[in-house]
Amino acid sequence: MPNVTIDGTEIEVPAGITVLQACEMAGVEIPRFCYHERLSVAGNCRMCLVEVAPGPPKPAASCALPVADGMTIKTDSEMVQKARNGVMEFLLINHPLDCPICDQGGECDLQDQAMAYGRDGSRFEENKRAVKDKHMGPLVKTIMTRCIHCTRCVRFATEVAGVPELGMLGRGEHAEITTYLEKSLDSELSANVIDLCPVGALTSKPYAFVSRPWELSKTESIDVLDAVGAAIRVDSRQTEVLRVLPRLNEDVNEEWLADKSRYACDGLMRQRLDRPYVREDGMLREASWDEAFNAIADQVKSNSGDRIAAIAGDLCDTESMFALKQVMNALGSKNIDCRQDGAKLSSGARGSYVLNTGIAELENADAVLLVGTNPRWEAPLVNTRLRKAWLNAGARIGIVGPQLELSYPSEYLGAGPETLAAIADGSHEFAEVLKSAEHPVIILGMGALTRADGEAVLATARKLADTCNVIRDDWNGFNVLHNAAARVGGLDIGFVPGEGGRDTAGILAGAEAGDIHVVFLLGADEIDTAKLEKAFVVYQGHHGDAGAHCADVVLPGSAYTEKNGTYVNTEGRVQLGRQAVQPPGDAREDWAIIRAMSDVLGAGLDYVTLGDVRTALVEANAVFDQIDELSSSDMGLAGAAGDMDAAPFESKISNYYMTDPISRASETMAECTREFVNANGERTGTDG
């Protein structure tokens, strides 16, 4: 490994790294605008200049210069200071003095570096240039006169998002960043360009003029709007969540965040349930907690356990499902299910229902088979890993299911089970691709597993995995990609029907037939509520969505930003969500509501605090003691032998921007739906 001297200190660094990276290893900060660790090197801002010997007597761009043995690097010499001073002066020539009204103020790289490395005045006396603002959709606000042409946004769109719609046109003072066809930036990751922009050229349109960063309380948590479990930071002021930003987690989301996870937060304040309701004469009226609990108790105590059922929704924390399961057990009911979409997954062998490869390891795959899934919509951050697999390893990616427009080249193999069966028995050519791959991957989506023949599909996929050597001692490429944050946690605790119990479809059919009299909906809104008209429905949740509309008693719960809770992502990683704000009105944490209700129902739980619930959770399943870790999963048997339907697989998501009660209540997501789903998003390029 090369030995280099940085500001008089000799250190040993890995071969092949740049001077800038070597300086960071030595603890020396190098200013930069265009350089970013996850993007290709552009070397066009020249802010990272350093003095290097041996070499020409002029500063060198440290971001693009590889280290060499014996190199001497000076980062604060008179030459370097003068060079940085000059670069900063040139950058500020055309930059407007917008700091007092710029949303980037207080967290702006240009602001900070101008103070640290710039001059106290400008010698430029000519007119500043102005650039027309571009329309990049409902999420990204543009003030292009502020742009310093670092090209981070261009490289992100091209390299990470896979939508090469941004670029630079013109030369000299006529150069500008634009979308080639004057249209919206159509990507589920588009708002990450806001985080990357070192100035105020690209800012958040929904967050414009809302707050300054020093006014906000910052809470580290995780996202629950899909099953990836991205690390996020929730910025709030008093009782309102104002924005959600990504946090660094190399194993899950790196430092990116999907647009829905970032911008659906305005839905947290709309259509909220903030007090209990009881239905009288066909109308819901406000009630006290005691009235609501007593109304539930009257119905529960007049029915046997086999006439009572519970369905858990997609956003539930594991503690709440665990508490509700114990209440149902005490009432003698085996009719419980966390799979409101009807997924044919059992709670037995964990390896049969998680993403065994791990999100980070997906980028090492060299052959991928997607079955009944659209990762671009169902898990955009998983899709970025698959794109890296194509970029870095040249992975061949085959699709069985709907034809998709992904962010990387793919091979359409077929629409349904017959293609999957052909690959499994080796008669399809893609079977050989998987067999010859060093790191083959199969990803099963809910579009394949929520069908009536889901168990047969799962068994066929497992047969394919064995046939094509996808599961080995040093590699497990058998994966299930979930859409719901609550799903893996629910399966882990066994929130599925006991022997002789009913699943979601059975509960709904039983309620329609009059065999199920009481149904508890724990945040379950993605079901056919019309089948519940004859039953007494208790809805516990945070939004006035489908479940609340059909309920006879409504219990106001807390959204994910308003409570502490445990979630398990699609790869089986146990994660902690943390409370950022207080729930509105009389709303309470879900586990606490269930605990209070259990006393009235005669099924009293012993918990006093959330810690008590977590202790019991760990005792029931030790995996919940392994926070933010991946544990090895027993594969066991997957699915059940049977005939598969000839119907094609279909993606479970038709509108990426509205998949849950929070995003459906969001005005920003409604605008995205109008822009990208209901219209083609074309504009003149100068719209606001």
Where in the sequence are the language-model features?
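N-terminal leader/propeptide and maturation segments of large enzyme subunits in energy/redox metabolism
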Residues: 97-130, 441, 455-456, 581-638
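Short, structural beta-strand-to-alpha-helix junction motif
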Residues: 3, 17-21, 317, 589
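A basic, amphipathic helix-loop patch mediating RNA/tRNA/ribosome contacts
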Residues: 19-53
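Short beta-alpha connecting loops at secondary-structure transitions
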Residues: 3-5, 69-75, 177-182, 407-410, ...
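Catalytic alpha/large subunits of respiratory electron-transfer oxidoreductases
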Residues: 92, 96, 143, 149-150, ...
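Flexible glycine/proline-enriched surface loops and loop-helix/loop-strand junctions
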Residues: 135-139, 368, 443-445, 574-582
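Fe-S ferredoxin-like electron-transfer domains
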Residues: 46-232, 237-240
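Short, contiguous acidic and Ser/Thr-rich linear segments
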Residues: 11-17
